[in-house]
Each structure stands twice: as C-alpha cells, then as structure tokens.
Amino acid sequence: MKTDKLLFLAAAAACAGTACGKTPEKPNIIYLMFDDLGYGDLGCYGQEKIETPNIDALASQGILFTDMYSAAPLSAPSRCCIMTGQHMGHSQIRANYERLVPPESLGWNAIFLDDTLEGQQPMLADTPTLAKMMQEAGYKTAMVGKWGLGYPGSESTPGKMGIDYFYGFNCQSLAHAYYPTHLWENDTKIATGNETIMQGEPLPEGLDPMDIASYERYTGKFYSSDLMYDKLENFVVENAGRPFMAMWTTTVPHSAVQAPLDEVMHYVEKLGDEKPCTDGGMYLPNRYPLATYAAMVTHIDTQVGRLVAKLKELGIWENTIFIVTSDNGPACNGNSPMEFFQSGGPFRCRQGWGKSSLHEGGIRMPFIVTWGSRLTPSKTAHVAQFTDLMPTFADLAGVKAPQNDGVSFAPILLGKPEKQQEHEFLYWEYPSAKGWLAVRVGPWKGLVKRVIKGNGKMELYNLEDDPREDKDVAAEHPDIVKRMWEIIEANHEPSPLPVEKFQMNLPQPELPAEE
C-alpha cells in the first residue's frame, strides 16, 4: 500500500507538470515594436491626447514595466542588441550606417530614385540570434515591418538570421516612406503599386499651404502599415497550430508622418487646426503634422485590437504572450510632435534629450506584457533592458540561450517575482552624436557626453529623486562615479565590424575629488 501511494504521488506530480506525459505547451510570442514612440505616447503611460484603447486594455490585463530600457538610442543598434542579446559594448552594429552612401551631389534622398543604394551594414554571417534560437526551440518565426540589419543579398538578411518569413522594409532609410514603391517578401522584391514620392523637399511654390489638396501628391494608393498587418495576420492564422514568434516591427510613428486621411481628420476635429509643415523637415510636407502623428499611433492600436480578436477567434489567445514597446525614444528635431504630446512622459525630452541620446527620454521605453489571463495585472519597477529578451524567450521556450548580456525576466511572467535576478548594472555606449556613455546601478545613473571630443567628466543622477536628470550630483558621490568608470572600462570592446562609425575610444576619466 505504501509503495502504491508513493507511485500515485509521483504520477500526480508528473501530471501536474506535464499534463500527464504531454510536453508543456510553449507560448506563442508576438513582439510589437513601434519606431520612435516615446515613453509617454500611450494612454497607459499617461498620454491624454492620443487614443490607444486596445493597447491600454492589454496593459490593464498584464504587466506594465516602468523601468525597461532600450539597449541603444537609435534604430539599427537597438535592433542588433535585441537580435543578439549583446549590450552596446559588445554588439556589432553601433550606429545607423548605409552600405552605400550616395555622393553628396545627389543628396540623402537619392535612395528614393535608386534602390540599388538600399540597405544597411550587415551583421556577421555566423551571428547567433534570438530568431535562430527560437527556431531551434521549434518555433516558426516571422518579422513583419523594418529590418535594417543587412542589405538585400548580404550575409545578414532576415532569412539568414533565423526569420522563416519576412515581409516589409529591408532598408530603414526607405522605411521612412509609408507609400513605398516596393517591399520585400523574404528575398523577393514586391512592387506595391505606389509611385515614387521624393522626400526632403519643400512644398512647391504656388501651392496653398493651408489647402489639404496641396498635399495630395504625397499620398499613394497602398499604405505600408496595412500591407504589413495583413501579412502578419496571415502568418498567425497559418501557424495557429504550432508555436510561433512574430516580431511586428512597425515603422510607426517615425517620420515621414502619414496616415489615412479620414483618421487624420478625426484628430483635426479633436485637436483643432494647426500650423502645416511645408519645408520637408519631417521628410514630407504635411498639412496636419500633429493630427497625423496621433492618427498613426491610433492606426496601429486599432490593428492591435484586430489581432487580439483574431487570436481569440483562433483559440490561441490564452497561450500567446503579447509585448508592446518601442525601439528608442521620440525624435526631437525642430518639427517633432514630441513637445505637443509630451512624448517623453515624466522625462525631459527636448532637442538632445530624446532619440540619439542616452538621457532617459532616449532610452526609457514603454513595455507591456500580456499572456491571456495568466498574468496578475500589475506594474513592475524591475530594471530591465532589451538584452534581456533573448534569455527571457529562451526560458519561456525551454531552450538554452547563446552567450548574452541579459538577465531573464521570465520569473516575473511566471508569477515568481521572488526568484527574479536583478542586474548588477546596465551599460550603454553610443559612438554617434559626439559619443555617449551611460551606466545604471540601482537608482544611480552615470552619463558621459562628448566622448569623441575627449570629455571624461561624468554626470551622476539619482533617478528615484530626479527622473528628469536635472541635478548632477557627481561631486557629492566620487565613490559611485569611480565604480561607474570601472564598469565602463570592463564592458567596452571595439565592434568586430571594420566600420569607423562603430568605433569609439574611451576618454581619460575625470574623477571628482574625494573628501
């Protein structure tokens, strides 16, 4: 009897963990990453003007991260860090870099007339990636949206980096167009039916800048966000019976700001009339740039609602992890809608403090995770970075991750926050925009600007008391500054790619005097 009882208990334990012999079901993963969306651009993060009801609903059902960071403040390096799990001191792609730079006489927009120029610097052919890891775990993988990590035909196209199905923009420069002449489906260039629309030019003289009809020349027949959403939904439907990972790397709301006119007019009625952008400063002239920006974000939010409904219809919603985030902070150029919408949320976000900077406005990201009804709705102040995605997905998929700089946050998703490991530190470097370095340790953030100019003076902020980074307290805490520099020196390595733009030498540290 005692032996029978022990056997029964052992069998019951096995059933509890594996559904009586069946392998535990691996969750599907949908990773929606906006492009240049600010921390404060979603309703669930405090936005009051842009409507995002479907994403807000996800936040109310899942976990909202308050301290999630991009690993880089710009598109290509951010995406490289996600794919490799490496922080910017170890990663390959450390800046945006076109593989073929057009002659200055042609101008930056020459790529819209000569698509043989398209594409960016590729990663190395043997690079371990998050997508390859998920393939090894038995997942079907897709990316719909923007790639930007290797030109067509290179050793670093989506298909060669672990993506089973790709549809969208190979080239991030061409991704600035919402009515493109072509998109890529795997390695095949697909004509969209749109005519070429040149960017970076002002509204022609003689046209009335206050007349919406003057801007019709900048609209095509087929809106890229709709073309890509349809492919995403098709992928989900076709793979509903097996584990899948879909990376939805939308180009919204990156300039040029464009959206369907009826959706723009909704916000014109809501926000009122506004000054048009006529100089091409947002890549294209636009009669209602603020209303259009808002309409773009809401357009994707509506698609989120459609996709959630489809997942429920297919019966796979309860086993689908749905993540919403952004690649980096909002653009802060002279025509940016960022100030009007307070896109930086609680963080200072102005010229030099958003995208392309390592201030909080450039790297602190909205980050929402839902998993059917499995998660207890909550907020977490766990400090995390995009490098954590690789080990987290590995834990969820039951596979060993390649070497990476991340810390899995799977315990938070699995309802075991007491087992969550914390980062000893987060590290950033960025060799563009005069060069930046940053480290976060607990509430402390060290920041070095103008690194390429040889500046070695670190600013220090206590983010708990000063999230806007207003008060530099480095002089009061020389011991913390010294520790930050030790972390920098231990984590900086040259990029393995022979691209000068990716390299940055460390300056001589200027340490504050100890009392």
Per-region residue spans from a language model:
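Active-site segment of extracytoplasmic enzymes that catalyze sulfate/phosphate-ester chemistry
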Residues: 39-139, 153, 175, 189, ...
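Short Gly/Pro-enriched turn/cap motifs at secondary-structure boundaries
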Residues: 71, 123, 338, 355-360, ...
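Bacterial N-terminal signal peptides that target proteins for export
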Residues: 1-7
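Short, surface-exposed beta-strand/loop micro-motifs that present aromatic residues
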Residues: 131, 234-235, 435-440, 445-450
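Loop/turn elements at helix/coil->beta-strand transitions in domains of secreted/extracellular proteins
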Residues: 25-30, 61-66, 135-142, 161-164, ...
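Bacterial Sec-dependent signal peptides at the C-terminal "C-region" and cleavage site
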Residues: 14-25
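Conserved beta-strand->loop/alpha-helix structural units within folded catalytic cores of enzymes
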Residues: 34-36, 137, 144-146
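Active-site-proximal cap/lid insertion segments
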Residues: 34-50, 64-66, 94-98, 149, ...
